[in-house]
Amino acid sequence: MGGFGAHIKSNRTEITIQHKGKITDIPIKDLSHFLLIGGHTIQTSTITSLVKEGVFISFCESDGEPVGYISPYDYSLFKEIQNLQKTAAPYSYALACANESIKSRILAIEKYAEEIGPEILFSGELDILTGYAKELENMVLIEELRRIEQLVRDMYYEILGRLISPTYLFKRRTSRPYLDPVNAIFSFGYGMLSSACTRAVIGGHLDPGHGYLNRGNQALVQDLMNCWKPKMIDNHAIGFLRSGRLHQNGYERTKDRCILHDEVIEELIHLFSKSIQEELINTQIDVLIQSLRGEAQFSIIKP
């Protein structure tokens, strides 16, 4: 549920969402994950009903920034996996995440250059990116992996900025608050992807804040989702922007931030709900757990 102003209530079998004069009833049995983005009113009894039925609830700011989650008790009962997670040697996991994050971006850029034209790249730019990818195997410190992965991400977003209309004023990926609609759209998509990853991580009894390449409250989630952003979010966001479907009346710029209007948010929810591959994410968590138990070698599954 995105936007603002929805009223959400429930009975024992259904939740009812009233938003802008429209009423939608959803059977609770059809839900496994309920994502709330933006400011809405939800009854505490509805939260109770959802959690009792095993539904994972995620909360994000209006721009997609993850805030937190509510999970049923059995999502976090077992500590065995978290102990394995925290005692595992981090380097091989960090290397796998950095390697796939970089390669996925290089592949995406090559695809854009093939479809749109090589003029989107400056001379030698692709060689620099592939050189960074080759350097990874020679690095012995996780801090070095993190630095190179960030450099590639920065270059990647600068190249993406050349694919879309300059009227959107997007030059690079920035931190909050987002002042242009492109950063706002990326952030919204990443919030949805983050929520899907967090649900899978918590469902696997892992600690979302204990990562191997990244640091912070969502470190493990970031480790994984950075590998999937180009295919699951960016590709579809760029397609949406290049299609001309985002008009100037679809967003509002203020001196503080860029606000996407509800009709754009609804379209993005529909777009990214189809592009985020939850089955793949769940399988990835299984692979990680098997690796932590010594039953398999860790690798990132490609979308």
From Swiss-Prot:
The entry lists its GO molecular-function terms as: DNA binding; endonuclease activity; metal ion binding
GO BP annotations of the record are: defense response to virus; maintenance of CRISPR repeat elements
What superkingdom does the record give? Answer: Archaea
**What residues does Mn(2+) bind to?**
E149
Magnesium is among the record's keywords: yes
Report if keyword Ribosomal protein is assigned: no
Q: What keywords are annotated for this sequence in UniProt? A: Antiviral defense, DNA-binding, Endonuclease, Hydrolase, Magnesium, Manganese, Metal-binding, Nuclease
Q: Which CDD domains match?
A: Cas1_I-II-III
Q: Which cofactor does it need?
A: Mg(2+); Mn(2+)
Q: What is its EC number?
A: 3.1.-.-
Stored PANTHER family: CRISPR-ASSOCIATED ENDONUCLEASE CAS1 1
Entry function: CRISPR (clustered regularly interspaced short palindromic repeat), is an adaptive immune system that provides protection against mobile genetic elements (viruses, transposable elements and conjugative plasmids). CRISPR clusters contain sequences complementary to antecedent mobile elements and target invading nucleic acids. CRISPR clusters are transcribed and processed into CRISPR RNA (crRNA). Acts as a dsDNA endonuclease. Involved in the integration of spacer DNA into the CRISPR cassette.
Family, according to the entry, reads as follows: Belongs to the CRISPR-associated endonuclease Cas1 family.
Per its UniProt record, what HAMAP family does this chain match?
A: Cas1
Q: Which NCBIfam families does the entry mention?
A: cas1
Self-association state and partner proteins as the record states: Homodimer, forms a heterotetramer with a Cas2 homodimer.
Protein name per its UniProtKB record = Putative CRISPR-associated endonuclease Cas1 2
Q: Which gene encodes it?
A: cas1-2
